[in-house]
Amino acid sequence: MSGRWCNKVSKFAVRLAALASLTVFANEGPTEITSVEGITEYRLNNGLQVILFPDPSKPTITVNMTYLVGSRHEAYGETGMAHLLEHLVFKGTPRHPNIPQELTERGASPNGTTSLDRTNYFETLPATDANLEWALDLESDRMINSFISAEDLESEMTVVRNEMESGENNPFRILYQRTMSMAYLWHNYGKSTIGARSDVEGVPIDRLKDFYRKYYQPDNAVLVLAGKFEPKFALEKIVEKFGVIPTPDRSGVNQIYPTYTRDPIQDGERSVTLRRVGDVQYAMVIHHIPSGAHEDLAALDILSHVLDNVTSGRLHEALVESEKAVSVASYAYQYRESGPMLTYAQVRKDGSLDEVWETMQDVIYGTATEDLVTDSEVERARAFFLKNIELGFNSSQNIALQLSNWVAMGDWRLFFLHRDRLAEVTTEDVRRVAATYLKPQNSTVGFFLPTDNPDRVAIPEVPDTAAMLAGYKGRDAVKSGESFDTSLANIDTRTQWATFDNGFKLAMLPKETRGANVVVSLALLFGSEPTLRNNVTRGEMVGGMLMRGTERLDREQLIDELNRLRARGGVSGGVYSAGGILQTIRENLPAVIELIGEILKTPVFDA
């Protein structure tokens, strides 16, 4: 037997053996890990984590593939690589050579995001078995078969450069990047996701391919599926598409080590000043806070709302209402490791930035030491967050996308645990975190201008999320809605009409909705040619003032009442119409309708 024939036989035998092993592997079903409030986690033998959220009330399917790699994982010379790879994965595979076109043909669009801790790709499609199978085939194929070619890298470089230049020309974004880089001396959170221009433009294609092969593997990925689908069918297709992908070899350079770089405890104030072309000024401050999984984040969320809430926020009252600043905001970011609490103010070009910064310090550090947070402030903030979480959970698509961030923090169930913590946080908790983390010694300040005391703060380590969540069951699942036929004929049949004596027309579409959710849409048309003439601006001003209070409720009380009724949305108007859209729950619908009437009938136009 010739050597050439032996080689052919050997290769054929190897292929048969590999095919047989993959077939056996694919036939092994997934393992159910846990289930919380209607969401169930499974694990494939190759390590792929699968999260299913069936929602028959949604006529769509959202497929969200998250890879546990972001800019935090980039090595020296690799900054921007995770984001650059996100672009190249859309360039296709041999089986899916034109991904954007295929998505468009199915009524979806290319969607991908890169953050500090993760990268995700997602598509929302009409709920059919064919679309589900196609999306799963796409995601499994581009997990391991993306081209990642030098030609695609060159062609995409213009797009990436444009993103870089857009960020560099945005005063807020560039100041935030500079302030973060000063706040984090060693940790990769101090490097922007977009990366250094020199790294992005100079990265060898082979290095990018190595990054792709290392991190785009089933044992480093989480597949979230939400919407209208049959779990049994979905699991069968997931095993069929992803189960044949072998577990990667994690030896040598392919081993993924936990990131272990930690910044030393900050020992004094730091500051950054940017002088660039621009039309506005900014003052911002970053304080180090614990990781997103830490129990203090719930209290820090409440604290940020106490500072920046419109109408009652302390910074809003001190800076916006006094017209010293155009706007203020505060965010307690939730990352896998120790993250930032960002607070900033936007100031007019001719305003006094020094005066604004002095006021910011008085409010922030006064809140931490003297003018302590009150019970009413905590309750108002709690109602705001819990309302948004509750109403947001009515959208399975929204939850599917949110879970990417919670997965990257350590576990998708942290979403529910954080909600529970928000419900239980006390005023003393908020005062404690303010006193613990809001210290000048723990701050990095940034100023954008157009044209020190050794009191150290120890940041807790990332908690053991597995131990923390062992046995966690969550609450009862939200009541599912009906599987609604969205055809015009069915909508017409199900819609109930009524006309009042005054000519007011009412259309009602009763159906079982997820979480007993109700949406009210109101449209009032009025006016004639004489009343419309020269009144456009006046009409817009009147419409814009409707949500600022009534004879019974001032603006803050009106917002509180909407939160109490678990309603969101609003009423506005113009010179020829008024109306709005509000969302609430079924039991509160009568009260919400009464409130809409009050807003329209008895508004107060304070000077």
What are these regions (language model features)?
Residues 2-16:
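Bacterial N-terminal signal peptides that target proteins for export
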Residues 17-26:
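Hydrophobic h-region of N-terminal signal peptides that target proteins for export
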Residues 25-50, 230-276, 317, 416-525, ...:
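Proteolytic maturation boundary segments
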Residues 53, 58-74, 80-81, 98-141, ...:
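M16 family metallopeptidases and their MPP-like homologs
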Residues 88-95, 549-551:
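Catalytic Zn2+-binding segment of zinc metalloproteases
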Residues 157, 172, 209-241, 442-443:
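Non-catalytic, conformational "gating/processing" segments within enzyme and secreted inhibitor domains
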Residues 161-167, 259-274, 381-392, 584-585:
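Short, conserved secondary-structure transition motifs
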